[in-house]
Every structure is written in structure tokens, then in C-alpha cells.
């Protein structure tokens, strides 16, 4: 201060400019994303901050993760922090839920028609394949539903394939397997045989044909065709064996039975006798 005569005096004032105010921070909204999506802020959002003095406060974040109900699910608590040039900071929290609600993609093998002699296991009829957005190895199983066909050995199998990922999401597809029986039984005839005319020509004596088939018990029958021999007691029988399964398929084979008469008659002479010359010798 200076008066009119030029006298002056001074005093000093100290002005301290301080920054004790933390930035104002605004978190991005909580979000639920699929397990295939990125959890980076570019996808889930970034916090914004303003400060009374610092025009560009530093914004950072840290994550704390809690596992979910299955390997592909989790909850991330993302803590955002805004710090100004004077070290003042403020925080806010964002919740990011990582979900797996997408079912696997399942591809069924082609429908197929096969004979009853062929296995219906997947190694023959084909297996379904599955891929998943998060689980690298979804579980693939199947169940069969059988509908009878026109005969016991034929029918239609509806094979329902099921793919399940680690989070329990499932998808299904159906494969149709038609089982046909167009194959006749395999029949084996008994050996050809020659018997004496005194022997029985019934199968219990001459042998019986055997048969195998999809049908566990094909019916085996026979018919005979007889040709006379050189004498009344001799003949040749052609026995045609027929095996028929439950689906009506049949096969045949022939057995030859020769009926022979090669045994001489058994003769019994009367006792020796002495008679008078006047007696008859008849």
C-alpha cells in the first residue's frame, strides 16, 4: 500500500490451489453375453469419467470371476476406476454374466434299409455328430423305438439321437432304420441214403434237414416223389425238404433215398422123411 507522500508497506498472502475432488465415473450397463462372445470392453462397454480439473482422467478396470453352474458359464464383476492427475480416484462396478444357452448342432446319419441278418448297431448304420458353440466335446447318445413290420423279423427302428453339452443344453434328431427280411433260410439236407425194403423211410430213420435264419425257428417240411425200381420192393424216393421262415421266405434241398431189396428169402425145409414106395412124394 502507498500513501500520497510515497510511503508504502507490504504484506504477503499465500493462495493454495488444491485438487481433492475425485473424478465422476459412470459404469457401462450390466450385460449378459453368450460364452462365445468376447468379454473385452469393446464388446461389453467402457466406463466414462469426468473430473473438475483433469480433462482426461485415467480409466482402468480389474476383473473378479466366479464360476457358474457349468464350465462355460461364469459371472465377472468388473471394477472400473477413474484416477485424475492428482491421484484422486473413484470406482464403480459392472456385472458381466457369461451364459451358455445355445444347444449343440446335431447331424443325424442317413436313413437306411438293411436285411435282418445285418447288425443295427451304429458301427453299421452310422453315428450322429455334434458340435457346440462352447463345449468342444458334447455327449452324443441314442434311444431306439421299435415298430413291428409285416412279419416278426422285419420292422422299423426310429433311432433318436441326443446331443448334450456341459451346460445341459440339448438337441435331437431322428434316424429311420428299416429292417427287412428277404433272405431265405439256409437249409442243409441229410445225406443220401440206401436202405433195405424192410427199413422205415421216415425221417427218424433217414435223417432230417436243418435250417438257420433270422427266424430262430423256421418251419421244415418235406414232400416225396417216388419212382419204382427193378422189382416191386425197390424204389427211389426223391425227398424235397422245404424250410420256410416267418416272413414267407423259403429254400429247398433234395435228398435221395434208395429202397433196395438185396436180401435173399429165408427158406425152411421140412424134416427128412422115409416113406413106402406106395406113398406119394408130393
Language model features with spans:
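Proline-threonine-serine-rich low-complexity tracts
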Residues: 1-282
Amino acid at each position: 500500500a502507498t500513501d500520497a507522500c510515497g510511503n508504502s508497506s507490504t504484506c504477503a498472502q499465500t493462495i493454495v490451489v488444491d485438487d481433492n475432488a475425485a473424478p465422476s465415473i459412470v459404469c457401462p450397463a450390466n450385460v449378459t453375453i453368450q460364452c462365445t462372445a468376447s468379454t473385452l470392453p469393446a464388446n461389453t462397454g467402457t466406463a466414462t469419467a469426468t473430473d473438475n480439473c483433469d480433462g482426461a482422467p485415467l480409466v482402468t478396470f480389474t476383473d473378479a470371476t466366479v464360476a457358474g453352474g457349468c464350465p462355460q458359464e461364469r459371472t465377472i464383476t468388473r471394477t472400473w476406476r477413474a484416477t485424475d492427475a492428482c491421484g484422486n480416484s473413484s470406482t464403480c462396478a459392472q456385472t458381466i454374466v457369461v451364459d451358455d444357452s445355445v444347444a449343440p448342432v446335431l447331424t443325424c446319419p442317413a436313413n437306411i434299409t438293411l436285411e435282418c441278418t445285418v447288425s443295427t448297431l451304429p458301427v453299421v448304420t452310422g453315428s450322429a455328430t455334434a458340435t457346440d458353440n462352447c463345449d468342444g466335446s458334447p455327449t452324443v447318445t441314442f434311444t431306439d423305438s421299435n415298430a413291428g413290420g409285416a412279419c416278426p423279423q422285419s420292422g422299423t427302428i426310429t433311432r433318436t439321437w441326443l446331443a448334450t453339452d456341459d451346460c445341459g443344453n440339448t438337441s435331437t434328431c431322428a434316424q429311420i432304420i428299416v429292417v427287412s427280411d428277404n433272405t431265405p433260410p439256409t437249409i442243409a439236407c441229410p445225406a443220401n441214403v440206401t436202405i433195405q425194403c424192410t427199413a422205415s423211410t421216415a425221417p427218424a430213420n433217414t435223417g432230417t434237414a436243418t435250417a438257420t435264419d433270422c427266424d430262430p425257428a423256421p418251419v421244415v417240411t418235406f414232400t416225396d416223389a417216388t419212382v419204382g425200381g427193378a422189382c416191386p420192393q425197390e424204389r427211389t424216393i426223391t425227398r424235397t425238404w422245404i424250410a420256410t421262415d416267418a416272413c414267407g421266405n423259403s429254400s429247398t434241398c433234395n435228398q435221395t433215398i434208395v429202397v433196395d431189396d438185396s436180401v435173399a428169402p429165408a427158406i425152411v425145409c421140412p424134416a427128412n422123411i422115409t416113406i413106402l414106395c406106395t406113398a406119394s412124394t408130393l
